[in-house]
Amino acid sequence: RRRLSLRGELATAIRRRELYLHYQPIIELDTGICVGAEALVRWQRPDGTQVRPDLFIPLAEEAGMIGAVTDLVIENVVRDMRELLVADRSAHIAINLAAEDISSGRALKMTSKHMAGSGILPQQIWMEATERGFLDLDRARTMLAQARRAGHSVAIDDFGVGFSSLQYLEQLPLDALKIDKSFIDAIGTESATSPVTPHIIDMAKELGLWVVAEGVETEAQLAYLHTRKVEFAQGWLFSRPLPRDEFVVFHHKRQQRYGAAREHMQNPRSVPIEREGVE
């Protein structure tokens, strides 16, 4: 009954546009530059209480509402970040795609629709998908290849927690791999997963993918990532997810201190990942 009630609330929240975004900065480790952010959807009820994303996102997927959630995310990214992205062509915002977004191809159409006339360039909107989105491998490969041809970079998110990671990675048209926080947490511990982290990094580099470490919280983790030559990271060591205005301030201060992203980040497609049978 409680889940049914929450489902009804979510439908109302989507209709009333109560969902909003926070932005977690993504940092280039060699330079300290803020190259962009990951857009993270949030839901605050009218009474001020927050509903956790790990509750309402799976519910939206189960109830067939995830497409509407993704539409709102895309619309809000364009609205929130238009001024920043037009002013700083080296910056990008990453949006998360659900399995339905990939199988339907709707997210790509909605992104193109909302970007039209905004001044935002396709390479400034990155698309991220978890391994759960690749159940239909052929469809996923087609949609992600279309996204890359349109100018978007594509990343696999939360890598390492899926059921067939290695098999899928070689078959998908990707630009970047984001290592799941659980593997970053294992750095320097006796965890059974700790030997997996360097293997993931090496595998990504062999395939020519950028590596983004998620959930970085300690200086020890950061030092390890430097030694492994991981390019990018995000996590509370750098910043919590921020409301739009706070992220703009964060990005501006970081830019004043470290500068803008290097030329290769301004056009990710300048480093294409071409593999036989993929594109």
What are these regions (language model features)?
Residues 59, 105, 137, 186-187, ...:
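Residues that scaffold the ATP/ADP-binding catalytic core of kinase and kinase-like folds
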